[in-house]
Amino acid sequence: MNELIKHKLELLPDSPGCYLHKDKEGTIIYVGKAKNLKKRVRSYFRGSHDTKTELLVSEIVDFEYIVTESDTEALLLEINLIQKNMPKYNIKLKDDKSYPFLKITNESFPRLVITRYIKKNDGLYFGPYPDSYTANEVKKLLDRIFPFKKCKNPINKVCFYYHLGQCCAHTICHTDKAYWDRLIDDVKHFLNGKDDKIIEDLRSKMLAASEEMAFERAAEYRDLISGIATMRTKQRVMSKDLQDRDIFGYYVDKGWMCVQVFFVRQGKLIQRDVNLFPYYNDAEEDFLTYMGQFYQDKQHFIPKEVFIPEAIDEELVAAIVPTKIIKPKRGEKKQLVALATKNARVSLQQKFDLLEKDIKKTSGAIENLGQLLRIDKPVRIEAFDNSNIQGTSPVAAMVVFVDGKPSKKDYRKFKIKTVVGPDDYASMREVLFRRYSRVKKEGLQAPNLIIVDGGVGQVNVAKDVIEKQLGLTIPVAGLQKNDKHQTHDLLFGNPLEVVSLPRRSEEFFLLHRIQDEVHRFAVTFHRQVRRKNSFSSTLDHISGLGPKRKQLLLRHFKTITAIASATSEEIQALGIPKTVVEAIQQQITDNKNDRSSP
């Protein structure tokens, strides 16, 4: 804990509010809320914590706080701050969590379409459905039963679907509004499970077709009836009142939380949502934060009712979710929440079981690798790779694997300082010397194994630096790739030789992951440096454009091409004066003309 934090801790008020933890770059890494800011924020820097909280605390170099009038206001503010800043230690909902809906458009001739986006007053929506396959299957069934218009734009002749009896062909079909109202009502009844009348009608048509010896048509009606029956069986009835509701349950263990949501539509369970994440505060508070984020996503349909567990404050939920909040006390409804909670517990236990299995596999892999190389178990492995294009913007990267898993906080990037031109050996020599002279000088943790991406030459360079120049006794290995740029050979020993490694062994998969990861990290860093260099060279020597403004442009636009495409107003919106904007645009134009001239 630094002096700044010590001083700020003394000034914290006994009030509700939000706090924002920051790292050494000033980036917000965690947002939390508290009924008492003084107690909550101080708790991070006192006493012992579990591993994940220790990791969070180790990165905190500053914090801010915002006082609110109430706990409810703090919760709302927390949700907004998380959405705005996306701190890396906060709950992150899974990407692409929008579900498909069926929609009847409100056009003059309505169409039945599938969409993942809900727009107010834009039509009738049914769903959500668990996935696009299910939504498409239901739509196919509806298309065969109800003749909605299929064509988006007006045409002057009937379409293919009209001949199949699946389109009204608006050029000749009913323009009577009452007709469409009846059709839409029929769809509503059908999707609400009131399909007996439709089945009876289809059965009558099937029998009539059979009597007329029109067996193909009769078979079509039979298949439609079968499709409706199949759709019925796929939906489990969870309540008899046919209400739309979301049912929440959660379970916590070992510093992790699992939230389970059952989506119930017209009394039927159509889908569940599962999310697992580490939590850092009180479980009930983090659950509330999750709910707030969940419904702040505009693609999440808000049902008429939401069931929540007994431990959760109804008033706080009501403040963030604009619908009826129910905390069931008894009977079937309470059992539904219990079922969601039970499923959350099972999902969390499955995660722990899989983690344990993975740990055993990984532990076995590094143990076997150590035995294969006749070295101590390589608990910590550091791997290196260079990246450049014809010697331009040369960089290198180091990734660290601890207990067989990436330790990203230990990753390091290196800009090559002493090498001119494309010389991978000299670049590797520089990077390894810089890294391990510092390890030796500062007493940093040394790895059990160093891996370089390359063949005999790279390994010999690495051994020369480690053993001869620095006098260290750290084993060095090399990973060679084949013509397809895939991990192929492990080089080790004195003299160097290819180590026989079964291609389907866990040890091989571990080395493959390490090589891929260090290559990815090096290439990503090289792209960043190259882009920044290109960016800087173009924008150098522009009066009024200093390092801070250049950094601002880089963060916002990413590339020179993006700046060239931007309007003056868009660039000025970043706080850059009009005269400087004009100079930037002129410089980009001049550079473009220079490149195009002979």
UniProtKB/Swiss-Prot annotation:
InterPro entries: GIY-YIG_endonuc (IPR000305), GIY-YIG_endonuc_sf (IPR035901), GIY-YIG_UvrC_Cho (IPR047296), RuvA_2-like (IPR010994), UVR_dom (IPR001943), UVR_dom_sf (IPR036876), UvrABC_protein_C (IPR050066), UvrC (IPR004791). It is found in: Cytoplasm. SMART domains: GIYc (SM00465). Pfam families: GIY-YIG (PF01541), HHH_5 (PF14520), UVR (PF02151), UvrC_RNaseH (PF22920), UvrC_RNaseH_dom (PF08459). Residues 14-91 form the GIY-YIG domain. SUPFAM superfamilies: C-terminal UvrC-binding domain of UvrB, GIY-YIG endonuclease, RuvA domain 2-like. The keyword DNA repair applies. Interacts with UvrB in an incision complex. The UvrABC repair system catalyzes the recognition and processing of DNA lesions. UvrC both incises the 5' and 3' sides of the lesion. The N-terminal half is responsible for the 3' incision and the C-terminal half is responsible for the 5' incision. This is UvrABC system protein C. It comes from Streptococcus pyogenes serotype M6 (strain ATCC BAA-946 / MGAS10394).
